[in-house]
Regions:
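Extracellular, repeat-based ectodomains that mediate carbohydrate processing or recognition
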Residues: 1-163
Length: 163
């Protein structure tokens, strides 16, 4: 903890980037991961799911992905990207609220669940939906993303990596 704007920290002098991580993947040691869940498979593998900014330029743009890390012996961790492409920041709430609606279940494989923001949230196009002008839907830009979007719950069945 720091009480002098980061000039010093209590709790030891180890650089936090050198502390154990849920994965030993090179890019994940220096990027953001958050809202994690953990579960064990039937055969004893640890699975950990979380939002992740290690892909592309997510750390700079604020976009994110969902990842799954796994280990059998807790010494070496593997990581799998669960999302097929990065998600823009959420746009529904002022201030960029990102719902913490995540979860993880496991049996033979892992079932991570997350709030996905890749689906645009269309609105009624201006000047439509009136007499003589049939309604049309438009996708509009957002202040913090290329388009307004919805947070939808996604679930995937994913083999747990071993590392």
């Amino acid at each position: 903890m720091s009480d002098d704007a980061g000039a010093s920290f209590s709790g030891g002098d180890t650089d936090v980037r050198e502390l154990p991580s849920a994965t030993s993947a090179r890019r994940q040691r220096t990027t953001d991961q958050w809202f994690q869940w953990a579960a064990f498979t039937r055969d004893g593998k640890l699975a950990t799911s979380y939002y992740d900014r290690q892909y592309g330029d997510d750390e700079r743009t604020g976009w994110s992905d969902f990842s799954l890390s796994g280990s059998r012996g807790l010494r070496h961790f593997g990581v799998t990207r669960v999302t097929s492409s990065s998600m823009p920041p959420p746009t529904q709430f002022a201030g960029g609220f990102f719902g913490d609606y995540t979860g993880l279940a496991a049996d033979r494989v892992a079932y991570p669940a997350w709030s996905d923001t890749r689906t645009p949230a269309p609105v009624l196009c201006p000047g439509t939906g009136t007499p003589g002008h049939p309604p049309r839907l438009c996708v509009t830009p957002a202040p913090n993303a290329p388009y307004n979007n919805d947070q939808e719950i996604y679930v995937a069945a994913v083999r747990v990596p071993s590392g």
